[in-house]
Curated annotation (Swiss-Prot):
Transmembrane segments: 102-118
Protein keywords: Chloroplast, Membrane, Photosynthesis, Photosystem I, Plastid, Thylakoid, Transit peptide, Transmembrane, Transmembrane helix
Family recorded in the similarity comment: Belongs to the psaH family.
GO biological process, one term: photosynthesis
Gene encoding the protein: PSAH2
Descriptive protein name: Photosystem I reaction center subunit VI-2, chloroplastic
Xref: InterPro entries: PSI_PsaH
Membrane protein topology class: Single-pass membrane protein
Compartments where found: Plastid, Chloroplast thylakoid membrane
Length: 145
């Protein structure tokens, strides 16, 4: 692997595209051309043809289901398989929570009330400075504290 000193040569031979003005001193970076030269292979240019179905049909008015996709996959006209009382319950009590704002307010009120309850029922002696000494003090070597 070539070091940076061999890549950034003093004599300009080929400029690195995109790195010309990136040096801190303001000098341009140059590299020596490689010893191997890669020859590009000539390729034939051809037209790209995208096909939908037969005979290059891209939009078929006769078959809109396959052209635009099936939009009624999840729709159903069948009656609800759930109990009517259960359906009425969820339509009545879950309807306010379908809107994002109401759901957010409910979550904020619930979280605030939970924090209030926890802070009211917690004990304040969590820190050792508030609890005070837990054991009687030990006397020193001369019988003093």
């Amino acid at each position: 692997m070539a070091s940076f000193a061999t890549i950034a040569a003093v004599q300009p031979s080929a400029a690195v595209k995109g790195l010309g003005g990136s040096s801190l001193a303001g000098a341009k970076l140059f590299i020596k051309p490689s010893r191997q030269s890669f020859k590009t292979k000539s390729t034939r240019a051809g037209a790209v043809v995208a096909k939908y179905g037969d005979k290059s049909v891209y939009f078929d008015l006769e078959d809109l289901g396959n052209t635009t996709g099936q939009w009624d996959v999840y729709g159903s006209d069948a009656p609800s398989p759930y109990n009517p009382l259960q359906s009425k319950f969820f339509e009545t009590f879950a309807a306010p929570f379908t809107k994002r704002g109401l759901l957010l307010k409910f979550l904020i009120l619930g979280g605030g009330s939970l924090l209030t309850y926890v802070s009211a029922n917690s004990t304040g002696d969590v820190l050792p400075i508030k609890r005070g000494p837990q054991e009687p003090p030990k006397l020193g070597p001369r019988g003093k504290l």
